[in-house]
Swiss-Prot record:
It is found in: Secreted. Disulfide bonds join 1-6. This is Conopressin-Tx. The keyword Transcription regulation does not apply.
Length: 8
């Protein structure tokens, strides 16, 4: 992921 706290 590209936001705070998401793993991918």
């Amino acid at each position: 992921c590209f936001i705070r706290n998401c793993p991918p």
